């Protein structure tokens, strides 16, 4: 039977999750990714209970697919090592039904990509424009010179989304949150660290996340003007954090063995204001393209996963609505003339309006909260930082965990 066709712009976590969720709803999917291949190196990602529930809804076991670690504790420390707050992941599992996990980002994206049919991903291909004038069925233009007719376009093209700029030209765009971030993976099986931690200094932070294979996902931030770069990030990290508590110096020793290109540095931006809607015609925005947020809650990828799963859930099944070639071809161009385009348009339009209603307020609340948490972590004034530390230490652990309920229990499939 002919299938509806979706074109996904971007093969990040949000785009690949959307592609897989749509595929399992019966859609034919084409993913256009500008990179020549999926990255083999990079950073890690924490998957919170809300993201794990969303993945479970489409039959993805992230822990099994990508290899995961469950830390014993999670919390925030001072540079001298004193814990400001700490939570056992067993308590989180008891409260939320599942413990958060940490996975290598390259392994996770590779697992999502491997679950898609052969030929779904088109590497080295950028979506350059979407021709949907007059409300007609979109034609996706690509850098490879191919025109892809689509019943749905998923704009998962990242924080600098070209499709967002094209369709929301009056939007304020991105907001620099005042920090740069370094991210890296280091191999240190000798350390055997049980805790996921973030250490707050004055205007700088250092995070440690154990992975399952003896590696650690490390990140660090510093308050600097945008565009600030050092000649060697390894030296910069040792200079900034070498005197902090154990095991940070030992981890920095492992960083010395990395190549400079193994350390990713990005200035941190979020969306200056929410988009008025998360859809236009038959285009839906998700992840950073829709609601770029600071990484301070570990929810950027998690919210992208929620977006993708809820979008696919709300859309009509993909195996209806076309006459075309009988569905045997794998080329979406062969399916360019659906028999009931009006019905297809109406069904998709209704689903996308429901998607905006389901996702816009939640994702913007997370974006705003992440910015506020980042401001706390980035305080440079000694008195303000000391007051912050006292306030965090004085907050009971149960109350702090309860404060995460809206995040970790917030995923729901709309009726």
Residue ranges and their predicted role:
Residues 1-6, 23, 48-168, 172-185, ...:
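Conserved N-terminal helical subregion
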Residues 2-4, 65, 81, 250, ...:
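C-terminal helical "tail/cap" subdomain of flavin- and related membrane-associated enzymes
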Residues 9-10:
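Conserved N-terminal Rossmann-fold NAD(P)-binding element of oxidoreductases
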Residues 15-16:
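N-terminal Rossmann-fold NAD(P) dinucleotide-binding loop
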Residues 23-43:
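Glycine-rich FAD pyrophosphate-binding loop
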Residues 177-209:
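Flavin-dependent oxidoreductases
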Residues 190, 202, 212, 222-299, ...:
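FAD/FMN-dependent oxidoreductases across multiple families
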């Amino acid at each position: 039977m002919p299938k509806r066709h979706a074109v996904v712009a971007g093969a990040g976590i949000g785009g690949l999750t959307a592609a897989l969720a749509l595929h399992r709803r019966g859609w034919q999917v084409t993913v256009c990714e500008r990179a020549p291949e999926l990255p083999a190196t990079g950073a890690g990602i924490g998957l919170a209970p809300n993201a794990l529930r969303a993945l479970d809804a489409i039959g993805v076991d992230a822990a099994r697919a990508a290899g995961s670690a469950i830390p014993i504790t999670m919390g925030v420390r001072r540079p001298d090592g004193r814990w400001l707050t700490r939570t056992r992941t067993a308590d989180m599992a008891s409260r939320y039904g599942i413990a958060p996990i940490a996975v290598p980002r390259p392994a996770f994206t590779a697992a999502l990509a491997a679950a898609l049919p052969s030929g779904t991903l088109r590497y080295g291909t950028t979506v350059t424009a979407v021709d949907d004038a007059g409300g007609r069925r979109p034609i996706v233009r690509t850098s490879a010179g191919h025109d892809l007719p689509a019943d749905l376009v998923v704009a998962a093209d990242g924080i600098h989304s070209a499709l967002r700029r094209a369709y929301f030209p009056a939007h304020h765009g991105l907001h620099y949150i005042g920090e740069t971030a370094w991210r890296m993976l280091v191999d240190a099986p000798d350390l055997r660290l049980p805790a996921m931690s973030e250490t707050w200094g004055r205007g700088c932070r250092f995070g440690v996340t154990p992975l399952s294979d003896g590696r650690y996902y490390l990140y660090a931030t510093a308050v600097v003007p945008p565009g600030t770069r050092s000649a060697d990030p390894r030296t910069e990290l040792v200079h900034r954090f070498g005197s902090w508590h154990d095991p940070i110096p030992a981890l920095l020793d492992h960083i010395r063995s990395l190549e400079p290109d193994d350390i990713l540095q990005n200035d941190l931006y979020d969306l200056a204001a929410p988009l008025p809607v998360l859809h236009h015609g038959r285009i839906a925005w998700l992840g950073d393209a829709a609601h770029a947020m600071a990484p301070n809650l570990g929810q950027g990828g998690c919210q992208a996963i929620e977006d993708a799963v809820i979008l696919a859930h709300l859309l009509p099944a993909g195996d209806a609505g076309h006459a075309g070639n009988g569905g045997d071809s794998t080329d979406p161009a062969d399916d360019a003339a659906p028999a009931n385009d009006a019905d297809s348009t109406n069904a998709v339009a209704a689903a996308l309006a429901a998607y905006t209603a389901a996702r816009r307020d939640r994702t913007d609340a997370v974006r705003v909260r992440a910015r506020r948490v980042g401001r706390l972590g980035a305080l440079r004034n000694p008195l303000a930082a000391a007051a912050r530390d006292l306030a965090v230490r004085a907050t009971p652990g149960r109350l702090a965990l309860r404060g995460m309920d809206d995040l970790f229990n917030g995923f729901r499939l709309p009726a």
